[in-house]
């Protein structure tokens, strides 16, 4: 209905000139029209639906359609013209009009155009203003179209009026010409002041006009009546205006602008707006004219002008290109439009209109809801030019131009008014048909839908096709403009509603021509055109003369048949082309809404013709343009080349685009292999193997690697069967990571599996990002992705089974976390320099490529056996733009390595976040454990604050701007202690660490600056000796986790060799010792035994890893029964074959045990620890670290203690470093049984300190990989706090240990500390301690870390262990307090065993207090007591008054005692480490 309304309106406009009703409404009430237009805005919405119904007769619909588009385009055109050059436009228009239509204007004016003109003038003035505004907005493209459409509209309206009134057809056409001229003049005069306000009103006015146009309106009376009933504004013109109005300022302008943008943002309509200068050429004239014609047409023929405008706009786009068409249009704006002059105005108008329509359509189409359907449809018809532009517009425009040329020739031949009008009509019709055929091809599918909802669908269809058409029009604007000028103007009128179908325009024209005899001639050409459309170029010109005869016959008859043709038409276009379908349907719907009776035959014929023409046109558009140029010498020549090129390109472009889309679709599937297309990639990969021939995705991915494999096979082409899977080495976010060997080359690779079964959205976005980013990063320190393979050779199977992709990486033997936790490696300062140098080079490269890694942690730093480091796992990486900082999520980077700005909610972060993570890794390389281990963000921030100081504006001015600054404040203000805590590391490294761990990200050093630091600037990687890495064992995170789990469950792998632990042991052990010493004044010997209970548990954990179930059972029995066993017996029970070293240790242990027995059971514990210490080469200084319960070193002098020690030693012996750990564990467990042994003559605080941290670490390690490397971890586990041991043990073992611990609470604390210290060095070196560091080592930290370390999946187990341990620890606490170790000593008691861990636990307790709860805290407290020395200072406050006291004072006291073993300064360092590292591990 919108189209019908438009047509009706336009017919009213031009037909109104011929019909009395039009003048009365148009001339009588231009103001009323404005009102109507205003009303029509509202009615437009109403009319949208009613228009959809299609009440208006075909004629009325056509008129309404034409008028609406004209109004819309006029508004735009007129506004643009007014802004650009009203005067020039007016003068051009006047000249053209005068040239064309002096006679016509006289006749038309006499007939009824005086009134009509006045009303139209008002409307046009308003419209002109509107159009000018719109044109200004649309500037170039809209102007051209506007001018073309307005001229065409004028011609079309005149012609249409003639067609409407056969009697007054010629008179009307003349009068319409004169009227147009007058209206243009009036418009020009009025447009200045009425520009915008009237442009909107004009829309309404054209509605009135449309309503008034009786001939065509009557033909479309049903629709018109409906529209009229809705106030005439809803009537064809009203609806058209209604649409225009509702959309009018926005839609008309926007639609116009949108169309111009859509078709050619700066093409016709903008040209027109720009065209004041451009007007001078015919193109410019048309543009100028388009505004003035708009005004005129808006007023006099404004409805028609608008309607035609749409068709004209189509040609107008082309005419807009060539000045001559515009000039021609201007000169003969009403009827000369048939000729080049008339065409030029019409085309320019048409261009305006088509754009205007296309905007309306596009708007409508963009929002189907915009159902000012009559207007919409009219716009659709109007929009047909839009269709013309690119898709079918080229072909359609070419044919139309040919028709226009033919029409021009016919017009030239038929100088008579009728002849002129008929030729114009014919060319216009033909051109319209061509255009519309193109449009139809575009719109055909749409048209089918639009039949259902003609208004909406048509609008949408037209809108969609229009942009394409516009492009084509832009290309072949001139031609189309000329063709459209003659043919489209009328076609648009007639086809305003039928825009989609070329038949509709012809039909409308036929109606007009039926009114006139010459127009009748047009009818025959229509059939001719039907066949010619395929020959758009040549056929249209010849047809132009015949066309006039055609209209008379089909004019009225066709209207009734129209409905039947419509369906065929829609069908035909659909079958013909996708382009055609969209076009015909809108027309069909328009026609049906108009009165399907008008051009059914024509519609079907035109549909076919337009389909054929549209399709052939696109292809043969160049050919049609060639003939056309002769017809329109000035414009056509220029247009034809342009059109020819554009039309073919348009079609080809469409096809190519479609092909590209298809190819692109396959590409994403291929991308999975190499590209990051998420949705398609999964299938494509599977598909790609079969489709290998055109795997573009491999090409996409290949460029990065350019390996022989890529030439051999594209990404995704190969199947994972080409690899032999060796084993699992990791677990990613979307699958496992496998170690595999390439069957062809024999090289080792890592296969990262990307599963799609759980992906609802196809390929995981993280995998896509990783693929895209890795393809851009080529650096020796960034892991290299070789290719992508699928797990199914057959694409169908892949799709059916939801297969997976595998990212193929070069294989790296280890990752940093696995090595650190394994305890198998000791990194020297040179090694650390080498690692950091490579890491920072890779990071600096990424940052210079503008990528943020956002997930730097030890497990993502890969090493090979040659000491080469590579940065891996770019799944969280994102492109970073410093200039356009955009917010990203702050939930990135593993918690332990997350910088304070992310914890405080910063979303616009910088590469400094990665530098912080690397600083954490630097500290970890020295401490062998994560320096900040918490399981909650608040706890993590607390740990950072303790080491680096509290975030405050003094040191970090912008911190107050962060979202969580007020909600995440630490419990208290801390000063920066980093240099104190890490005083043991080289000064150059300390300086670098200090800069990398700066709170303020703006002051933090960059990756590039780190490379210039004293620590790294002189590092020459080529001269660095590679570290002695374990070639027999690949140390990966997963392996480390499993190892930890095993240790925790009691099956274990003994702690790692002591070699690595020495450093960590020393530091953490020392710290632990001081804590232990603090609790009891003379706790040197006691500490080792004090910890036996927890130590035993830890030892058991280590032993369990080493021992089988039966051996474990024996050990547990021994521990539980605490029966006296000799060391040899223990060895036998444990099936330990002691090597000479172990035997020596055992002997030493026996001696120690004897001494201890003499002294006390505690001494025995110490002895057992002493052997461990001896293993670690840490002489046990008889420092009694009095555990809470067993402050006396006599407690565990019993054989049971000896047995425990032996068991621990034996278990450690079983494994390379296990013996020491096991001894400790056994001693710890046994000691816990005897409770007596508190004093370890030799095992002193070192061991105790070392042991305790280990104990706690296990608890906290749970988050980390469950166990350290099985063989090397024994000492650490043994050394690990007893609490950690239980954690590592299975529930049964844990329960037994708990019982033992509860019985000998006093004993374990003292004993374990020594053992811990001794074991600790081993553990640290083995990374068993580090393991704990992650999960267990830092008792307190790990307690907290457990959540963090949950990543490592030990978290839950450790937490349970911790909970269980806490019970024991609590007992210890009780015993400690019993012993007189105040509550603060409680911490100390626990500190006893957790030399390293205690501190962590102490800290953890703080965190735990808030997070985990008292039990955990207590358990941590006990375990922590060992670690306490390290963590105590920080943790004490949180552990509780007692703990705090123990930590602060106890630590100080113990510092003296432990100093004996470790040396106070070192211990301080160790302590710092625990705090910084393990201590930090303590969550709180």
UniProtKB/Swiss-Prot annotation:
UniProt cross-references to InterPro entries, sorted A to Z: CDK, Kinase-like_dom_sf, Prot_kinase_dom, Protein_kinase_ATP_BS, Ser/Thr_kinase_AS
Compositional bias per record (Low complexity), positions renumbered to this chain: 286-304, 312-349, 1467-1484
Keywords noted in UniProt: ATP-binding, Isopeptide bond, Kinase, mRNA processing, mRNA splicing, Nucleotide-binding, Nucleus, Phosphoprotein, Serine/threonine-protein kinase, Transferase, Ubl conjugation
Biased composition range(s): Pro residues: 524-570, 666-681, 1264-1277
Sequence positions bearing Phosphothreonine: 57, 511, 688, 889, 1240, 1242
Residues at the active site: 855
Gene3D superfamilies referenced in this protein's UniProt entry, alphabetically: Phosphorylase Kinase, domain 1, Transferase(Phosphotransferase) domain 1
Zinc-finger found in the keyword field: no
PROSITE patterns (UniProt xref): PROTEIN_KINASE_ATP, PROTEIN_KINASE_DOM, PROTEIN_KINASE_ST
Modifications the protein undergoes after translation, according to the UniProt entry: Phosphorylation at Thr-889 increases kinase activity.
Subcellular location: Nucleus; Nucleus speckle
Compositionally biased region (Acidic residues): 72-84
Chemical reaction(s) catalysed: [DNA-directed RNA polymerase] + ATP = phospho-[DNA-directed RNA polymerase] + ADP + H(+); L-seryl-[protein] + ATP = O-phospho-L-seryl-[protein] + ADP + H(+); L-threonyl-[protein] + ATP = O-phospho-L-threonyl-[protein] + ADP + H(+)
Family: Belongs to the protein kinase superfamily. CMGC Ser/Thr protein kinase family. CDC2/CDKX subfamily.
Quaternary structure annotation from Swiss-Prot or TrEMBL: Interacts with CCNL1 and CCNL2.
Protein name: Cyclin-dependent kinase 12
Record organism: Mus musculus
Gene, per the UniProt record: Cdk12
